[in-house]
Amino acid sequence: ELLSSVRAISYASGSKFPSGGLCTAGYCVGNEMTISLLSKIEKHLLLCDNEATAEQYKILANQLPSMNNRIDEAYQNTRDFVNFISKTLPGAKINFVTDDLASLSFKPSVFSLDLPTKGVTDEEREIYKRKLNLRLINLMISQIPNESKFCVSYGQLKGSYWTIPATSTQGTTKEGDKDYIVRVSIAPSINIELHKKVFMEFVTEI
């Protein structure tokens, strides 16, 4: 409704929820006011021979019918895990969607975790936190190797994906602006209770 009176185009990466990570082709959808623009996009795809392949179309056609359910299930798993972390490690700062936004159907399944740190100086606190980040990630992937991965990903069919933006997606960002936090992506198919158990082990160790 907010964008119905202006030209709006939404692009979706096919490697995320549309295909569940099974292909890379993306697609865009526009409202009625973008018809003239969509025809130009179509022309561009044809001129550049950049249209999705038959196999990519097949994968998307098979996966798209379940996409909304997978998005909802992944969100519910993420919300469950976030709530657990909040209770077991109240000193952690968590960046995740609010319940109000989720009620409007904005349901991401990724959150950022700023672990509590300690030390006398800012430098000591930063060094400790960075070590703690790696300690948590290494524990998750060593204890749950079939589901936890140390990489950037989103919208996959199963498992959890752990990364530190400062050393992955923020490679070209100047050092002072990098985020040395933990970013976690949760899939619709996951043993969330096992993840809670391992996270509790981490909490008891620190």
Report the location of each language-model feature.
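C-terminal accessory/interaction regions of large nucleic acid-associated machines
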Residues: 205-206
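Active-site C-terminal subdomain of aminotransferase-like
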Residues: 8-178, 186-191, 198
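Catalytic PLP-binding core of fold-type I/II PLP enzymes
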Residues: 1-9
